[in-house]
Amino acid sequence: EKIMKKFMMLVAFAAMCFTANAQDVKTHEFDKFVAVYPADFQPKIVWGDVDGFNKGEDHLFEVVIDPYCATLATLKDFGDDRKESLEDKGFKCDEPVVKGNTVYVRGVNGNEVRYWFAVKDAALPDEECFRGLFWCLTTDEAKYKPILLEKMIPGLKLK
């Protein structure tokens, strides 16, 4: 009976831990979302390791920020187009989310998580120009936060 009680307590504790972790995993629901670029922002591609994750294992990410002149009229159209593109590559995607001047699409394929961001930049002359940001991670989604983008891209702010 004592062994059974201890076992049940262990099961309850494990269930509690799993529930807490499951809640923490929702990192794709951004609360800091609208992207702000400095006036002298330069498009760039960054390759490297996510802070503190490279402890004996390779965790690779790619970040691309580029001016993107779209023939798509709205952020939602851009998001739908990116979603379709990811699904064509075998990714399971969330519905595109539009908030403020930003749209993002998240897709997962095995252990690869891809994010597409597009930012409507009022400073760009063409109404149909976006600055696109592509973020690809091959690591456990629960281990990172959106704030890492700000560390990787000097001058980028999410608010």
Go through the PLM ranges and name each one.
Residues 1-4:
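Short, Lys/Arg-enriched N-terminal segments with co-localized hydrophobic residues
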Residues 7-18:
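Sec-dependent N-terminal signal peptides
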Residues 22-29:
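Cleaved targeting-peptide boundary
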Residues 23, 39-42, 83, 130-159:
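Surface-exposed amphipathic alpha-helical segments
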Residues 25, 49-51, 101-104:
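A generic structural signal for beta-strand entry/edge sites
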Residues 29-77, 108-111:
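Secretory pathway targeting signatures of secreted, lumenal, and periplasmic proteins
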Residues 60-65, 103, 130-133:
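Surface-exposed aromatic
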Residues 80-129:
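Signature of long, low-cysteine stretches enriched in small and polar/charged residues
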